[in-house]
């Protein structure tokens, strides 16, 4: 059985990147929550 995590920078950015977060309402909520918490990194 192969491992489930097969790293790819492109897929990582597209799925969890800043622009991907901004594209949806839920993603914007995620960013707002992370800002409120004072996270150093908001997204991948």
Curated annotation (Swiss-Prot):
GO terms for biological process: translation. Belongs to the bacterial ribosomal protein bL34 family. InterPro entries: Ribosomal_bL34, Ribosomal_bL34_CS. Keywords: Ribonucleoprotein, Ribosomal protein. GO terms for cellular component: ribonucleoprotein complex; ribosome. Pfam families: Ribosomal_L34 (PF00468). NCBIfam families: rpmH_bact. It comes from Bradyrhizobium sp. (strain ORS 278). The lineage of its organism: Bacteria, Pseudomonadati, Pseudomonadota, Alphaproteobacteria, Hyphomicrobiales. One of its GO terms (molecular function) is structural constituent of ribosome. The gene is rpmH. This is Large ribosomal subunit protein bL34.
């Amino acid at each position: 059985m192969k491992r489930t995590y097969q790293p790819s920078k492109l897929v990582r950015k597209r799925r969890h990147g800043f622009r991907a977060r901004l594209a949806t309402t839920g993603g914007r909520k995620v960013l707002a929550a992370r800002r409120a918490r004072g996270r150093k990194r908001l997204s991948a």
